[in-house]
């Protein structure tokens, strides 16, 4: 199991956050940067009801050079995909290769959000 947002974290590893905890933090007004690494097609099927920075992994060559201008290092970043695998890889990359410190992976991705938080978000 991956480390949680409230537990200890191994060095150079992102944290995992549940859909419920992320929703609670957003509802409490925390300024969390949401990054969605899914493809355009997936975003058209289901999306969070919050503003997200869309960085599809398949098109990383288009956005990687501007990454530091798009993400603030002093605010937490929550990364999501469909089920949490691609977002975990991206979160690890942010921490290990780019030195971001407050990086969370949405456990279970948008599918978990649909199940745990908002059944109005379609599952696919």
Please place each PLM-identified region on the residue numbering:
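Rhodanese-like catalytic fold shared by cysteine-dependent sulfurtransferases
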Residues: 2-33, 40-76, 85-124
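Short, surface-exposed ligand- or partner-binding patches at beta-edge/loop junctions that are enriched
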Residues: 80
């Amino acid at each position: 199991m991956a480390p949680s947002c409230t537990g200890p974290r191994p060095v150079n590893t992102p944290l995992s956050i549940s859909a419920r905890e992320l929703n609670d933090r957003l509802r409490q007004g925390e300024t969390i940067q949401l990054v969605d690494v899914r493809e355009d097609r997936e975003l058209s099927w289901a999306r969070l009801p919050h503003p997200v920075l869309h960085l599809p992994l398949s098109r990383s060559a288009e956005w990687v050079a501007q990454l530091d201008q798009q993400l603030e290092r002093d605010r937490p970043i929550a990364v999501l995909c469909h089920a949490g695998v691609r977002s975990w890889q991206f979160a690890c990359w942010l921490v290990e290769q780019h030195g971001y410190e407050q990086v969370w992976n949405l456990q279970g991705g948008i599918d978990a959000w649909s199940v745990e938080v908002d059944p109005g978000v379609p599952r696919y």
